Regions:
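Conserved beta-strand hairpin/beta-sheet module of binuclear metal-dependent hydrolase folds
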Residues: 1-44, 179-190
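Residue-level marker for buried hydrophobic side chains located in beta-strands
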Residues: 26, 52, 75, 188, ...
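Metallo-beta-lactamase
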Residues: 90-95, 113-117, 124-127, 131-144, ...
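Short catalytic-loop micro-motif centered on adjacent basic/acidic residues
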Residues: 26-28, 50-52, 166-168
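Short acidic-hydrophobic surface loop/beta-edge motif
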Residues: 6, 18, 153-159
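Active-site HxH/HxHxD metal-binding segment of metal-dependent hydrolases
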Residues: 33-36, 40-128, 134-157, 242-246
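Short, hydrophobic/aromatic-rich segments at coil-to-beta transitions
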Residues: 1-5, 154, 163-165
Length: 250
């Protein structure tokens, strides 16, 4: 698995481009500088299989609309953050504009897509979704959407030739998630866990007690797990258990 980190925006967000032999990439947290992300994709001959968001804060998603316009791949964001991520509540930091919302259709990401023109599969969410009266319509137009993750647990995901688990780690925001590539011993922790620190909880939706439980969950990952946080340097779970007060205390 290949990983290219691009540090973007005034708040120096670590945007990650991840790909395997299939040359179909996952873009994690396109916070700013869409042209720089595009340059990495072009240099490595990559298409975009999906855009993964660790949480909804503006500094992590402000290049989303521009990137998605060029690469209309599915976008994944937890339901708890999708509620406010594209509203005035998300002018955090305040000098960032309100993130532009790509065309959104709330779907269940655990269901596989069906080809355009084929009938829905009875008994799945390709029939009306959770009483919302929406149908999973996988036409080209419907691919411009945000796939809302809700209750994802730690079920294995496979996108292109990449296998990973999505870990719910609320606290910094209600919908924070981490992307754990178990076979590669890599976890993208967003703003939940940093080298030597953890995410702040004084912003709207933050909760220190809930974050403590999320940190405990991450502390139980294999010690050799490489940590790529939303800001700052890389680390490992082993190093953080030895040196990070916030992880040690939980």
């Amino acid at each position: 698995m290949n990983i290219k980190i691009i540090t973007v925006g005034a708040y120096e967000v670590n945007c990650a481009v991840v790909w395997g032999d299939a040359k179909q990439a996952l873009v994690i947290d396109p916070g700013f500088d869409a042209a720089d992300i595009e340059a990495v994709l072009k240099k490595n001959g990559l298409t975009v299989a999906a855009i993964l968001l660790t949480h909804g804060h503006a500094d992590h998603i402000n290049a989303l609309a521009k990137l998605h316009a060029a690469h209309p791949a599915p976008i994944y964001l937890h339901a708890e953050d999708e509620r406010w991520a594209f509203t005035a509540a998300n002018q955090i930091p305040p000098h960032y504009p309100i993130p532009t919302k790509p065309t959104t259709k709330i779907l269940d990401p655990t269901n596989p897509p069906r080809p355009a023109g084929t009938p829905p599969v009875e008994g799945t969410d390709q029939t009306p979704l959770h009483g919302r009266g929406e149908r999973n319509d996988f036409s080209a137009e419907a691919l411009a959407k945000v796939e809302v993750m809700d209750g994802v647990g730690s079920n294995p995901w496979k996108i292109a030739d990449l296998n990973f688990q999505t870990l719910e780690t609320p606290g910094h925001t209600p919908g924070c998630v981490c992307y754990w590539f178990k076979d590669e011993s890599v976890c993208f922790t967003g703003d939940t866990l940093f080298k030597g620190s953890c995410g702040r909880t004084d912003l709207p939706g933050g909760d220190g007690r809930i974050l403590a439980q999320s940190l405990k969950k991450l502390g139980n990952l294999p010690p050799e797990t490489r940590i790529i946080a939303g800001h700052g340097d890389e680390s490992t779970i082993a190093h953080e258990l030895k040196t990070n007060f916030f992880l040690q205390s939980h």
